[in-house]
Amino acid sequence: MALPNETLTAIFNHLPSSTLVILACVSLRFNAVAERILYSSISIIDSLSASSPYPLRTLWWCEAMCRRPHLIDSTRKLQIRWQADQSTPPPYYLVNTCERLGQVVPRFVALESLDLSLGPANLLTAHNTAPIHALERIIRNCHHFANLRSCSLSAERTKGVSPYTTILSSFLASLPVLRHLKLSDLQTGVEYLPIHALPLLTSFRGSPDAAASILPGRPVQYLSLIGEDSDVNRDNLPRMTYTTLPLRYLDLSAMSIRLILLRNISTYLPTIESLRVKLALRHTLHYSFSGIVSNRSEILSFLSSFFFSFFFFLLW
């Protein structure tokens, strides 16, 4: 007796991808079940170099999905990463690939996780192309991701490249159940983000200015900041406290911080329970070591008694 599709799916869900590929060749019925599982989670990594400058895997995937539209609703997780070395030529050709992704990705309305890391795709000066961020070429028509819970957007940045526009704000405003957000290359605040947007957001990773524009009015309890410790100042730090729930977890391990920032954090964020810090002592080693210990103890005394974990990664 043939097993029902539900039973086959339950069995196939526990098999590795390599086995599913083999089973997909056994019969049309096995193929139908195995394909849906294989396409439920897509992870594409393109390594770009002077000898291979095109994100071919990404382009092949776009064409494959156009040939298999019945599998689009099966995809729950989509990750696309482009990695490049210094020998890679100027990425003008990547604009067309971003435009192609902008035609395909919006069709994945059942997505729960979206991770786009486009490497050098945005390393174009504004006068060479339309003033739109490379990632915005993909997300500008993504207005129906009602199930998206996790979103990560990033690309390499330098001076003179196309900045984010209100397309990003419109995209974020269309995500009613988003809980986890990472904006790794956004150095400014998100402009014109409606106050009612992202009502369920619980964690954010990005620059201090971006955090200061996103956290107010939202239930964020997990915050991870990137950049330089000087980017955290008395303008943006107070605004990070305007969350609807107290901040509990703060991760500063992506930046080397000085002791004075700990003092400011203890003043503005007394509800922090877990703090990850990469403490840069090289700025203070010309003082006596006992003085450093004394200052650090004084600063830590300001911190809330709610701390249950406190990690220091010392940079000498």
Where are the predicted features?
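Long alpha-helical scaffolds
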Residues: 34, 105, 265-269
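Long, well-ordered mid-to-C-terminal structural blocks that present hydrophobic/aromatic surfaces
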Residues: 234-287
